[in-house]
Amino acid sequence: MIKGIKFISIPVRDQDRSLEFYTKKLGFQIITDQPFNDKQRWIELRIPGADTGVVLFTPEGHEERIGAFQAVSFWTNNVQKTYDELVSRGVEFLAPPTTADWGSSAIFKDVDGNQFVLGSK
């Protein structure tokens, strides 16, 4: 049976620029950074303490996915506090956090315009 999600792949335009964003601004750790082919590297990151990896890789022929909404939601215990911290690091949000019956959330963008949800668990 399926045990979990090994990694999600985020399409990026410039792997070095994206690697800096995800490690320096979001605090992800590098798990693997090695050549994949003559054009790209296989870069796998992980949120400290998490099981699921994040791969910064765009399969050839899928460049149109760069900058799209990724339907990925990252969670935190305190959306407002995390929002404030990420804004201070230069992360761009579409709007401040909002609160609904199910919790708080805010949408942020990476350096390629990919959009992600930051939400409470």
Question: Which residues does each predicted region cover?
Answer:
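Short, charged/polar surface micro-motifs in flexible loops or helix N-caps
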Residues: 48-53, 61-63, 79-81
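Helix N-cap motif at beta-to-alpha junctions
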Residues: 15, 77-80
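Vicinal oxygen chelate
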Residues: 1, 10, 31-34, 41, ...
